Amino acid sequence: MQWLMRFRTLWGIHKSFHNIHPAPSQLRCRSLSEFGAPRWNDYEVPEEFNFASYVLDYWAQKEKEGKRGPNPAFWWVNGQGDEVKWSFREMGDLTRRVANVFTQTCGLQQGDHLALMLPRVPEWWLVAVGCMRTGIIFIPATILLKAKDILYRLQLSKAKGIVTIDALASEVDSIASQCPSLKTKLLVSDHSREGWLDFRSLVKSASPEHTCVKSKTLDPMVIFFTSGTTGFPKMAKHSHGLALQPSFPGSRKLRSLKTSDVSWCLSDSGWIVATIWTLVEPWTAGCTVFIHHLPQFDTKVIIQTLLKYPINHFWGVSSIYRMILQQDFTSIRFPALEHCYTGGEVVLPKDQEEWKRRTGLLLYENYGQSETGLICATYWGMKIKPGFMGKATPPYDVQVIDDKGSILPPNTEGNIGIRIKPVRPVSLFMCYEGDPEKTAKVECGDFYNTGDRGKMDEEGYICFLGRSDDIINASGYRIGPAEVESALVEHPAVAESAVVGSPDPIRGEVVKAFIVLTPQFLSHDKDQLTKELQQHVKSVTAPYKYPRKVEFVSELPKTITGKIERKELRKKETGQM
């Protein structure tokens, strides 16, 4: 407990006494190139692997031996001047305490499910690693969810526990009685709440002594809910192999991270990107994970952060770069920034060119899914081809295939596939939990069919051409139309609806709803009704899903069997009709 009293951060977060940070060169220690996390060849899979013990504890030992520089493992700030800095040894202490809270206080066991619904606060990382230490399967989710979304996820996953914040506790309480599996509710807050355990107090008083479970590499580690087109989100279950991927030399080459690097990734905490780019990848390299907690997106704050702190690796969806470019500057030089990455959306060639012209930096594109993690990428030193996402990353063999799983010739449009036979890649999702039919449906011959369309050139560069499903990609948020349509139809004005993506110069796509009104609402003011429907969707599901565009129609295009033809509506939006 002496250390916790000395290290005043998370519980009673201290105000930083340094308004001006030292120059980047003073903050970033020299690279300890002779050391690195345990690694294997690109296709060798160890029988046992647990990220907490094999990687985090490895770096903690290096710190103890004086063989890692002074950079923190974790560096968190917010707009109020609060700051948290943890070393790997301190992370080890805290996450072992968290592990004991889960197993001893909450009675959770290896294989149990725990819903993790936190914003970008330090506790998110403690919970994720604490779950790894105990073998508990954590289920990240965005904090933008509403009671209906939470109910669906808790019921489908049979989660025995949940960790969340004040703002969501009431939503959870409103549906908890319908979740028979839910036994433990942990609250991250400065205030108590009836029926909830105080996460921070429990961690303070927990023992720092804990033995990490022995995990098989193929034991389950995490579940991500991924948007569906004809139904609600599916559960993509991953093994510990997802956390092993950054240890492969071919993957390490992607960013060539060093212990001296400071990496900032702007990802929603519910995305797979957060688990990979703000946890397993940077910490595999022993570098600093930097987080600026932004309750509201603010382009100017992002620019100020990149100017103020020694961040040299930065990741954001392409719309973030477009928003930065819209700011009033002809050129800008970030003092420490060296590597910029993007994913989640297609990068326009003109944005790549403009970013380089105004910042002097290249923009490296990467591509992945909730089911796969990183599939392909461009990386430092690699030729950038505008319009192409890069080449396959180990351990994946990526090909463009037809509907039967046959590999297509170069520059031929087809389905982007990942080879799963004779050996399934260790970082590919295990299955859609509880849905063997959907799991089997995405297998196509010897390949996993991503559901995305693309083509590959003679050099192995992959071009993304679009989705073969109806998923809407708005600023990196993947939105299933069924979720929005289900929310809309709850309103008495909506007889039926169809939701598609509509092109947008900033967000890539926005949600557009085509709505057939019920007779009693036909004479209502359409502008007022649009606002009412938008607010309704925000109130019953995650606000980012609301339709920014609404068009009232007399009927929807349908097939002879009565199925709505969203592709016809998409053509209308893209001017193809």
UniProtKB/Swiss-Prot annotation:
Keywords, in A-Z order: Acetylation, ATP-binding, Fatty acid metabolism, GTP-binding, Ligase, Lipid metabolism, Magnesium, Metal-binding, Mitochondrion, Nucleotide-binding, Transit peptide
Chemical reaction(s) catalysed: a medium-chain fatty acid + ATP + CoA = a medium-chain fatty acyl-CoA + AMP + diphosphate; benzoate + ATP + CoA = benzoyl-CoA + AMP + diphosphate; (R)-lipoate + GTP + H(+) = (R)-lipoyl-GMP + diphosphate; octanoate + ATP + CoA = octanoyl-CoA + AMP + diphosphate
Which residues are modified to N6-acetyllysine? 146, 204, 214, 356, 391, 531, 538, 549
- Coarse class of the protein's main subcellular location: mitochondrion
Q: What is the lineage of its organism?
A: Eukaryota, Metazoa, Chordata, Craniata, Vertebrata
Gene Ontology biological process terms, A to Z: acyl-CoA metabolic process; benzoate metabolic process; butyrate metabolic process; cholesterol homeostasis; energy derivation by oxidation of organic compounds; fatty acid biosynthetic process; fatty acid oxidation; xenobiotic metabolic process
* GO cellular component entries: blood microparticle; extracellular exosome; mitochondrial matrix; mitochondrion
**Residues where N6-succinyllysine occurs?**
85, 146, 183, 204, 237, 356, 391, 538
**Keyword Cytoplasm on entry:** no
- Subunit and partners: Monomer.
Q: Which GO terms describe its molecular function?
A: ATP binding; benzoate-CoA ligase activity; CoA-ligase activity; decanoate-CoA ligase activity; fatty acid ligase activity; fatty-acyl-CoA synthase activity; GTP binding; long-chain fatty acid-CoA ligase activity
PROSITE patterns from the UniProt entry? AMP_BINDING (PS00455)
**Which Pfam families does this entry report, sorted A to Z?**
AMP-binding (PF00501), AMP-binding_C (PF13193)
Q: Which top-level group of life is the source organism from?
A: Eukaryota
Q: What is reported on the regulation of this protein's activity?
A: Activated by monovalent cations, such as potassium, rubidium or ammonium.
Report the enzyme's class at the first EC level: ligase
Recorded protein name is Acyl-coenzyme A synthetase ACSM1, mitochondrial
What are the EC numbers? 6.2.1.2, 6.2.1.25
Its cofactor is: Mg(2+); Mn(2+)
Cellular localization per UniProt: Mitochondrion matrix; Mitochondrion
Transit peptide start-stop: 1-31
